[in-house]
Every structure is written in structure tokens, then in C-alpha cells.
Amino acid sequence: MDLDEVYKKVHCEPQNPTLDPDKNYEVVEAKDGVDFDLEAAKKSLESAKKGTDVSIPLTYTPADMSTEEYRKMLFRDEMSSYSTEVEGSENRKTNVKLAAQYCDGTILMPGESFSYNLGVGELTEERGFLPGPSYADGQSVMDMGGGICQVSSTMYMACLYANLEIDERHCHPYPSSYVPAGLDATVAWGGCDFVFTNDTDYPIKISTSYDGYSTSCTIWGTITEPFSVELYTETVETEPYETKYELDKSLGKDEQVLDTVGIEGLTVQSYRRVYDGDGNVISDNPEAISVYSKRDEVYKVGKLPKDKDKDKDKDQNKDKSDSSDTDKKTTESESDTQEE
């Protein structure tokens, strides 16, 4: 008998329960570790008389956690939750709803990362997405899936409050209305992404939804040590916008219409401060830097201000000319009178 081969087949380390992603996240039950003293077994076998049985005692080591305990701890705690109010067109709301549906129920094992772009998938009409407002090269445009950044930004906030590791995040060209400046997360299929990692010891579940008024993201997991997170931001730099005028010949010369709302440029530093269950600060670190572009205010006008100034100067010069002619005529009249 080859005891080395027997040992390879019998020996196993204790295994804690886990989830099997390949089997719809079924619970894989805990297993006890099995071992025996290989050298002692060899000596017993060598010294045994031919034809006699040799008993080899096995040692069993239980797993650190039972299957029942594991089931009770799975997704037991709400690690964080964040909601934002959804506004805009029906197309935009449809895109928000779809993005939330595609992400809802995602489970991440310890150490596993989540890509928002891969979670939502390609933004195609076949998958239900519609054209909605978006940004391209700093300009507001209609793009397929416009609006899904609100779900990624809401998820970003939830991940920060759950104290999860952020791997990739980008800010919009301009601050968003639904989250504070410095705390948004823009995405683009085939481009910038929002990615985070489950750096806890247990699986986490992403729960995302849209109820017709707001979109929400809740992170479910297992909190082993109580904590809380405070997020705060600092405006590092500002850049004021300018007011510009564009000629629109369909307007009267004294008419003007606001075409583009001005937005101040901002550079914002965000921070994540983490407390333990007793309120003591565990960490207080910079989170991300966000650079938002300025957008100039634009008015459509029937006549450009410089043209108005020219007309004003012309009118003033005309008034001066008329006044000079009047003075000249008066002087000439007075002169004639004197001569007479």
C-alpha cells in the first residue's frame, strides 16, 4: 500500500462555507479538515504482521464557521444606502430605470471588483435604452443612454459610505445637480468607468432601484466591526465664467434671449473620514480631486453689444453735429443782424 497516495486523497484543510458564483451563488457547505500522522502510519504498517489490519487514527479539524452561521451572516447588514431625485425627460428616466435594473442584485465575493460599464452593459436600443441628455467634448448633446451617470454617481456615494475601495472614478465636465460637487461619477461605454472592489471579508450585494421619483443604491454585507463614514469636500480653485453674446437676426435689435446658462469652473478635493463604533477617527484621507470646466453664459441678441455701442456713438456724434450746426446758424444770424 502506498501511504503517500492515501495521504494525498485523505488529507484536506478545513474549509469555511462560501458561495459558488458558477452555481447561482449557492452556499458551499463547510468541511472539516482531515489529517493523520503519515510517518507514524508508515511505521505501524512496516511493523505489522502480514495479513493483519492496521488502524490509522484520523484527526478532524472543524471549519472556523459552520454553514448555519454563515447563512445567518450573509448580507445581514445594510452597510450603506444613498438616494438621489431623478428629474428630466421621460427618456432620461427610462435610462435610469434600466441601469438600476441591470445592476440590481449583483453579488461580489471578497476581493472581487465591479465595473459599472460591464454591469449595465452596452447602451443600445435593442436593450431598451433611449437617447437622453449627455456631455460630449464639454457640450450638451443627446446620446444613447443619457442619464445613466446618475445611477453610477448614486452608487459611488453608497460605496463611499460603505467604506469600500474605489478603483476608478471620473467627474463630469460640469458639477451635477443630484450630488454635491466632487462626489459624482461619470461613465461612458468604451471610455471612462466606475469601478470598486469588495475589500471586506464577506460577500456583498448591490441593490439598485428606481421608483419613478428617485434612484437608490444599497450595499448589503456583513459588518464585523461597527463604523461610520463622513464625506466632506474643499473647493481648491474657482474660475468665473464670462458672458458672451451671439447674433441672432431673428430677434429685434433690443431683444436678447439666454441661450446657455453660465457655470463656474471648480477644482474640488473630496475626503473620506472613517469612525469606529465609539466615534473615534480611524482614518481621514483625501478621496479624489475633481476638475470641472467653466461654461460661459451665452445670450442670443438681435444686435451685438459692440454694434449697439457703435450706433450709440453715431447717435452721439450726430447729436453733436446737429448741435454744432445750430450754433453756427445762430451765430450767422446774429452776425447778419449786427451788419444790418
Give the positions of each predicted feature.
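Well-ordered beta-sheet/strand-loop patches within structured domains
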Residues: M1-E340
